[in-house]
Design a protein with these regions (language model features):
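Divalent-metal (Mg2+/Mn2+/Ca2+)-assisted nucleotide/phosphate chemistry catalytic cores
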Residues: 10, 90-91, 97-216, 222
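Short, hydrophobic/aliphatic alpha-helical segments
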Residues: 28-36, 65, 172-181, 221-222, ...
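Buried hydrophobic packing segments
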Residues: 51-58, 178, 196-204, 297, ...
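N-terminal catalytic cores of NTP/NDP-binding nucleotidyl/phosphoryl-transfer enzymes
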Residues: 21-79, 188-194
C-alpha cells in the first residue's frame, strides 16, 4: 500500500485537484509540499496536530515538507471559518508566536540536512510593491470568483474588510513564490482553505503555464458533526503550559465511543491492520481503545515519559490505582482560608472549575461536584485547611474533569 492509499484508508483526504497525479507524486517521493500556519496564538492546537501528523507521514514516505510560518499573512488575518474580523496582532506578538510554533514543529518534522524547510512568508510579502502586486498578481484574480468562495460568502452579510479580502491573494502568492524558488509543487490544508488553495494553483497556471496541486485534509469531527479539539474552557493546546499532558490525555480518554476508532485511524501511527482488528470492540474493550488513543497521542506530543505519567494519573481516577501526582493542581495558601476554612463555591472558582460563584452554585445544585469521592449537595459546604495538607483533596466536576487542590 502506497502512502496515498494509506491516507485514503485513514480517512484523511477530503478534496484533491488531480487524484492520479497526486497519487503518483506522493507514492514516489516526488512531492515538495507545504502547509501554512498563521501565528494567531502562542501555541499550536489539536487542529494543527492533524496537519503535523500528515507532514510526518508524507516525510516518512520520502516527500519533502515545507512548514510555512505565516508571519506575513497573520498581519492580514484569514477570514476562513470566521463570523467576525480577527483581532490584529502586533509584529512583536507575531514574532513571539512564530518562535513558539517552531519549537513545537521540530518535535514532529525532521528539519536536518534539508529534509524539510521552515520558511517565513514575511520575507517575500513585506518587500512587495503595491502597484507591482496589483499589476502582476491582482490582474490574475476575478472578483466575481473570489466572492463565490465559501470563506467570503459567509462574511458578506456581517461585513468583510478590504484587508481580509486580500488574504486569498496573499496565500496564492505564497504558493506561486515557493513554486518558483523552492520547487514546491503541492499545497495541503484544511477543507476550509480549498478556495485559497485553488487560487494558488490558478495563479501558477496563469503566470507560469505549469501545473501545481492541492489537497485538503478531512476536518476532525465527532459523531454529531462538531469540530473536535475544544473543551468548555477552550482549545486543546500542544503547549504543556496551556494544556497539561494529563489534561491532553484525559481529553482523548474521554472521547465518545462512536469516535474512538476514527480518531485512532486518523491521528495515530498504529498499523491499519491492528486498528481494523479493533472494529468489533465494544463495552470495556472500547475503554481500552480510548486508553490506547490517549496514550499514543500524548506520547506523540509530549513524549513517552509524560504519557506514562498521565496514564498513571488517569488510572488513579478511574481504576483506583496509580497516583495523583500529575493531576492538574491548584496550590492554596493560608490566605485562601478565612477563619481556617474555604467554602465550596470559592474553591471551585480558585481551581478554575467554575468561572464565577454563580456558575459554581449551579454546579453544586445540579449534583455535579464531588470532593474526595463525596458528593457535595449544599452550597454552604466548607472545608478546613487541614484537609488540604499532604496529598490534598481531589475535586471532580461532572464525570470526567478532575482537579487537585493542596495547601502550600
Amino acid at each position: 500500500m502506497g502512502i496515498y492509499e494509506e491516507l485514503v484508508a485513514r480517512g484523511l483526504i477530503a478534496q484533491v485537484t488531480n487524484e492520479e497525479e497526486i497519487r503518483e507524486m506522493v507514492n514516489n517521493g516526488k512531492a515538495t509540499f507545504y502547509i501554512g500556519f498563521d501565528c494567531t496564538a502562542d501555541s499550536l492546537h489539536v487542529g494543527h496536530f492533524m496537519a503535523l501528523c500528515l507532514m510526518k507521514r508524507l516525510q516518512m514516505a520520502g516527500n519533502k515538507p515545507i512548514a510555512l510560518i505565516g508571519d506575513g499573512t497573520t498581519l492580514i488575518g484569514d477570514p476562513s471559518g470566521r463570523t467576525d474580523m480577527r483581532q490584529m496582532l502586533t509584529e512583536d506578538a507575531i514574532k513571539h508566536n512564530a518562535e513558539c510554533f517552531k519549537r513545537q514543529m521540530e518535535k514532529f518534522i525532521d528539519f536536518s540536512d534539508g529534509k524539510a524547510l521552515m520558511l517565513y512568508n514575511s520575507e517575500w510579502l513585506k518587500p512587495l510593491n503595491y502597484i507591482e502586486m496589483l499589476r502582476e498578481v491582482g490582474a490574475c484574480f476575478s472578483v466575481n470568483n473570489m466572492l463565490r468562495a465559501e470563506c467570503y460568502k459567509q462574511r458578506m452579510e456581517k461585513g468583510l474588510s478590504f484587508l481580509e479580502f486580500n488574504y486569498m491573494i496573499m496565500q496564492s502568492y505564497d504558493f506561486y513564490y515557493m513554486f518558483q524558488h523552492y520547487g514546491c509543487n503541492m499545497q495541503f490544508g484544511g477543507n476550509d482553505q480549498w478556495s485559497n488553495m485553488l487560487g494558488g494553483t490558478e495563479l501558477i497556471r496563469k503566470k507560469l503555464g505549469k501545473d501545481a496541486h492541492a489537497m485538503t485534509i478531512t476536518l476532525l469531527l465527532n459523531s454529531e458533526g462538531k469540530k473536535m479539539g475544544k473543551t468548555a474552557s477552550g482549545a486543546v493546546w500542544l503547549d504543556p503550559n496551556k494544556t497539561s499532558p494529563f489534561e491532553f490525555f484525559q481529553y482523548w480518554r474521554n472521547v465518545d465511543d462512536a469516535d474512538v476508532l476514527k480518531c485512532i485511524r486518523m491521528l495515530t501511527f498504529m498499523p491499519l491492520e491492528e486498528i481494523d482488528k479493533m472494529a468489533g470492540w465494544e463495552g470495556s474493550q472500547l475503554n481500552e481503545a480510548k486508553e490506547i488513543l490517549a496514550y499514543e497521542l500524548t506520547k506523540l506530543v509530549h513524549g513517552e515519559e509524560e504519557a506514562e505519567k498521565a496514564k498513571a494519573a488517569s488510572k488513579a481516577l478511574f481504576a483506583g490505582g496509580g497516583d495523583t501526582e500529575h493531576m492538574p493542581t491548584t496550590e492554596l495558601t493560608n490566605d485562601d482560608f478565612g477563619g481556617g476554612s474555604i467554602d465550596v463555591l470559592t474553591l471551585l472558582v480558585k481551581c478554575g472549575l467554575a468561572a464565577s460563584k454563580g456558575e459554581a452554585r449551579r454546579l453544586v445544585q445540579q449534583g455535579g461536584v464531588t470532593v474526595n469521592d463525596e458528593k457535595v449537595t449544599a452550597i454552604e459546604t466548607t472545608f478546613g485547611c487541614e484537609q488540604f495538607t499532604g496529598d490534598g483533596v481531589v475535586i471532580k466536576k461532572g464525570k470526567k474533569v478532575f482537579h487537585k487542590a493542596v495547601l502550600v
